[in-house]
Amino acid sequence: MSVSIGVTYRQANSEDWKGIYDLYSSLSQEDLYLRFFSFHKISEEEVKKLVLDFSDHTTVVAVINNLIVGEATIFNDGEFALVVHPSYRRQGIGTELVKILIKIAKLKGICKVKFYTLPDNYPMIRIGKKLGFKIKEDEDEVIGLLNLC
């Protein structure tokens, strides 16, 4: 668990599914498109998988006053994704979530951490550059890669 100026960061647990679902439900269509590469409305079942079966991933949450304002998941292959509630963006929450995912990857012996995003997801690209990811830009997607080993 990590805390920074009113934000608590911790591994998600089974009781968090509703808060994560509410977080995703608060997102605009554009935000959902940036996160999933499609206009994808996440289901309760998909959210429950994030917090009930950790066999192939680890999910962490950012919490302020018992409200989940950010969620990040890293899979065992090193790929990760995250989302921060629109009202809490540009406060370092996304950056801190990625730093935590990098620590988790190191503990699991994952040598390469990566993200895929769309070219107009400037916040994610900015976080990647700030944290030392190599950024490869194509016209359809951006790949961020960080070698840990």
Language-model region placement:
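Conserved GNAT acetyl-CoA-binding A-motif
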Residues: 104-118
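A short, internal acetyl-CoA/4′-phosphopantetheine-binding micro-motif in the GNAT/acyltransferase core
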Residues: 81-90, 117-118, 149
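Conserved acetyl-CoA-binding loop-helix of GNAT-fold acetyltransferases
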Residues: 84, 90-107, 126-130
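C-terminal "cap" of GNAT-fold acetyltransferases
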Residues: 138-149
